[in-house]
Each structure stands twice: as C-alpha cells, then as structure tokens.
A protein has these predicted regions:
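PRPP-associated nucleotide enzymes
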Residues: 12-201
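Short, basic, low-complexity termini and linkers enriched in Ser/Thr/Gly/Pro
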Residues: 1-12
Length: 201
C-alpha cells in the first residue's frame, strides 16, 4: 500500500486526507512568502535557504506518518526505551532545482539513502512537451520508504516520470511520499490520476 503526500503553499494532500495549512499558521508561511516575493527572490542564498527550511519542516510532519519500533539506549543513569523510526528511508530529488529542498529533508533524515534523477521538458512545439530523463542514481527501493521531492509541482509530468524511472531501477517502495513546496491543481490531479496506491506495494 503506497501513500502519496503533496505539500504546497495551500495544503498537505494525503490520499484520503486533506489538511489545510491556512487553518493553522506556522513558520512555513514566512518561508513561503519570501519564496514568492519578487524582491526577496533576488537573494539566491536566502531563496535556497528557505527551500531548505521548508524541507526541514516537512521532515518533521512526514516523520509522524512513519513506522516506529521500540529500541533501547544506555543513558548515564540507566537503560531507556525509546521509539525510533524503523522505516528505511530513501530521499530522491529531481536535479537540480530540488537540491536545497532535498538537503532540508536530509538534515533530519540524516541516515537516509539518496537517489537522484535528471528530468526536463523537451518541447515538441509551443504548447506540447515530453519529459526526458537522462540520468539516474538509485539504490534498491524494495520495501523502503521513498520520499521524492521537487520544489514546484506544475503539470505533475516530471514528478510521475521521475517516480516511474526510480521504481524501474530500484524496485517498488513500500511507501512513497511526494513533496513539493508550490503546486497547482493540475499537477496534484495529474499525480493522483497516474498513481494507484493499491498497485504499489
């Protein structure tokens, strides 16, 4: 059973569940506002840092959906039981725009494996295009939790192309989360139309 989560400026969309971020203001509002501000956008370093910060915030939210197992740690006083993430996480991104967001996720999931895909639009004419994938580096995804990120979910075609090629090279993950910072309805709909949770084990 595969789970797809989409984070954008308005909501976290989780198949079967919709969370409206506007109902609960968070620090993400500030980061998103600066990302969209035409003046602040000119500061490349701040733009990248805000993407990284959003990746960190998203990691915290995503961690609530993962599987945990009880483990033991030796403290200075005694042995303590703690709940630790039991999922094997693989962080994947679409080069190169996704790197700052990927880094934010990696800052929290610091023991995760990494995967990279190079995907771009190859225009056939002024309005039609196809997605070209020229590079992929991917570990085994079998039975693991895949987190695939790209800052902008526009048409959704690049995201689906990246997901399909990752699965073709690494196998089917146990769970998949798709993370974007900004998205449009068309892209969300495209992702939902081209994924079937019941077929992804």
């Amino acid at each position: 059973n595969s789970q797809f989560s989409i984070l954008n400026s308005q909501f976290i969309y989780n198949i079967g569940m919709l969370h409206i971020l506007d109902k609960q203001n968070t620090i993400i509002n500030k980061f998103l506002a600066e990302l969209r501000n035409i003046d602040v956008q000119k500061d490349s370093m701040r733009f990248r840092r805000n993407l990284e910060r959003i990746g960190e915030c998203t990691s915290y939210e995503l961690s609530k959906t993962l599987n945990y197992a009880t483990t033991s740690v030796q403290t200075p006083l005694a042995e303590a039981k703690v709940e630790s993430i039991s999922d094997n996480v693989v962080l994947a991104t679409i080069l190169r725009a996704g790197l700052p967001l990927h880094q934010g996720l990696l800052n929290y999931f610091d023991d995760a494996e990494n995967a990279f895909v190079s995907a771009y639009r190859s225009y056939l004419n002024e309005s039609d295009f196809e997605i070209k994938v020229e590079y992929i580096a991917c570990p085994s995804l079998e039975g693991k939790t895949l987190i695939l990120c790209d800052p902008m979910l526009a048409s959704g075609a690049s995201m689906i192309a990246a997901y399909e090629v990752l699965c073709a090279h690494g196998g089917k993950p146990a769970h998949t989360h798709i993370v974007s910072v900004l998205g449009c309805t068309e892209g969300v709909d495209y992702v939902l139309q081209h994924t079937n949770p019941e077929e992804v084990d």
